[in-house]
A protein has these predicted regions:
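Glycine-rich beta-alpha loop elements in corrinoid/cobalamin-binding modules
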Residues: 3, 34-185, 405
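Structural recognition of alpha->loop->beta junctions
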Residues: 125-143, 314-322, 379-397
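Residue-level recognition of beta-strand->loop/alpha-helix junctions
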Residues: 8, 46-51, 236, 365-367, ...
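Radical SAM enzyme core and accessory elements
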Residues: 4-6, 37, 41, 78-79, ...
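Short catalytic helix/loop segments, enriched in acidic residues and glycine
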Residues: 22-35
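N-terminal [4Fe-4S]-dependent radical SAM core
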Residues: 2-5, 10-19, 61, 162, ...
Length: 505
């Protein structure tokens, strides 16, 4: 048995971030559960929950949310055999690298491992830029358990037998092991080890990925996404195979979380939960048959094809209150270029039905793809107006940033548009959520034009939406003050005033 320390690093966010998304770390919690089931002792250091009200300004104009790096290192047991660090979002890599350097300084002989979407996308870069020894590619549960078993028995020299790794061998050379297949049976994966971290810090504040609707815990109903959008890095992490869990097994987990943690709301972190219409119908019928009572949300974005009148009615009847669509663009030309398979007429019809059946609906758009022109943005503006007319409650307009592991990132690298993956580049990645900063990777539109287009699109949507439904801004203000949140705009307003009162903004 080995002692394994798993760390979720502090989170970086722009000072003028659109909203505070303080979420329990479901990915590391899954890995911790698998390692514990394999017989190892796990020390879980979640830097967010251990200092959930701590925000540290950085020279880059960002805030670091969570425990300071020296305090994290102080919590690592002296007799730990392996330290694992989660590295998901590329814009947080500078903090992750700083943490890894501090760990290596304190533990010069301890094996350092990282997993997550960022290091999976650029494993050689991550090894070259940090003191990491091993990178776990893709899904980490089985790979991490195998790594610890083999390392305990034979040291780093035996890691070549573990599929799904990139590592430095004893001579310092980078080695790739065999590709590990996706986990076949999602129902057999042990549930997240929430007992290893102070989950109550999130629950008591209603923190989660979605709107604050009480004591929220994240769950996953599926893994992977069958689509290949060129701006997305998920195919590198998950491949393009969508695999759902058994609805009954998922409902068993939800029932257990209600009983153990008095959870009242569940945020589904799936990349694309609603792909198969029959699956979501079976899930909703299962809630009804068991007479379960809870709210749930789909904050990541979902497909419109399967959400018709029947499905949207079932969603609301079984407690779903918030869903998000992610068409990204209203331009057919842009949609084809980014390989976004979405029908705008079907999307708008689905939006109308969702609103009619009581759901709170948000839509996500992205401006500034490399080939975008004003013509494409005007086409998107028309869809934004039609979405407001359909009655949806919120939109978010992001500016495109090229994430490592995505097709567009590789294209821009080959064209010389991304010359160095330095800290300035990673800082530009964080600007996607900053309401004051924009960086352009678009050939035809500059930074100021995209910033203006983003602001104009936001005002256009809310101007039309509130003109048609003039009571909504008053509800947003009242709910933001009271803390009884129903929409993402209320979450954003409340988060902004929270930062303002603390003197961040």
């Amino acid at each position: 048995m080995m002692k394994f320390t798993l760390i979720r690093p502090p989170v970086l966010m722009p000072t003028f971030n659109m909203a505070d998304l303080v979420v329990p770390p479901i990915g590391p919690a899954y890995v911790a559960a698998a390692v514990r089931q394999a017989g190892h002792e796990v020390c879980f250091i979640d830097a967010i929950s251990l200092a959930i009200e701590q925000y540290t300004p950085r020279d880059t104009g960002t805030l670091m949310h969570g425990l300071a790096i020296p305090a994290i290192v102080d919590r690592i047991p002296e007799d730990t055999g392996v330290v694992g660090v989660s590295s998901n979002f590329s814009f947080e890599w500078p903090v992750c690298r700083e943490l890894l350097q501090a760990i290596r300084a304190r533990f010069p002989k301890t094996l350092l491992v990282a997993g997550g979407e960022h290091v999976t996308a650029v494993p050689e870069f991550s090894l070259a830029q940090s003191p990491l020894d091993v990178i776990v590619l893709g899904e980490g549960e089985e790979t991490m358990a195998d790594l610890l078993r083999v390392y305990e028995q034979g040291g780093i020299g035996q890691l070549s037998t573990v599929p799904g790794l990139v590592y430095r061998d004893a001579s310092g050379q980078i080695q790739h092991t065999a590709v590990r297949p996706r986990i076949a049976d999602l129902n057999a994966i042990p549930r997240p080890a929430w007992d290893l971290l102070p989950l109550e810090e999130y629950l008591s504040r209603g923190y989660g990925f979605g709107v604050n609707r009480g004591r929220s815990i994240p769950v996953l109903a599926s893994r992977g996404c069958p689509y290949q959008c060129t701006f997305c890095s998920n195919p590198t992490m998950w491949t393009v195979r969508w695999k759902p869990r058994d609805p009954g097994d998922l409902l068993d987990e939800i029932a257990d979380l209600q009983r153990e943690y008095q959870a009242t709301n569940f945020d589904f972190y799936d990349l694309t939960m609603i792909v198969n219409k029959q699956w979501i119908i079976d899930f909703c019928h299962g809630i009804e048959q068991r007479k379960m009572k809870f709210t749930w949300q789909l904050p990541s974005g979902t497909r419109s094809e399967a959400i018709d009148d029947e499905v949207s009615r079932l969603l609301y009847q079984t407690g779903c209150r918030n869903i998000s669509y992610s068409p990204e663009s209203g331009s057919e030309e842009t949609l084809n270029l980014i390989k976004k398979r979405v029908s705008i007429p079907q999307l708008l019809k689905s939006m109308r039905l969702a609103v009619r059946n009581g759901l709170n609906v948000k839509s996500n758009f992205i401006f500034g793809f490399p080939e975008d022109r004003w013509k494409n943005l005007w086409e998107t503006y028309r869809v934004i107006v039609r979405a407001a007319w359909a009655g949806i409650h919120d939109i978010a307009i992001w500016v495109f940033v090229p994430y490592p592991g995505s097709e567009l990132f590789d294209q821009l690298r080959s064209e010389g548009r991304i010359q160095e993956m330095d800290d300035a580049y990673f800082g530009r990645l964080a600007a996607y959520a900053d309401v004051t900063q924009t960086y352009s990777y678009c050939r035809a539109l500059g930074r100021k034009q995209l910033l203006g287009a983003r602001v104009a699109g936001t005002f256009l949507f809310y101007g039309v939406a509130w003109l048609l439904r003039p009571w909504r801004p008053f509800r947003i203000l009242i709910n933001s003050i009271s803390g009884h949140l129903e929409s993402r705009s209320e979450l954003a307003v409340r988060g902004f005033f929270k930062r303002l009162l603390k003197g961040w903004a």
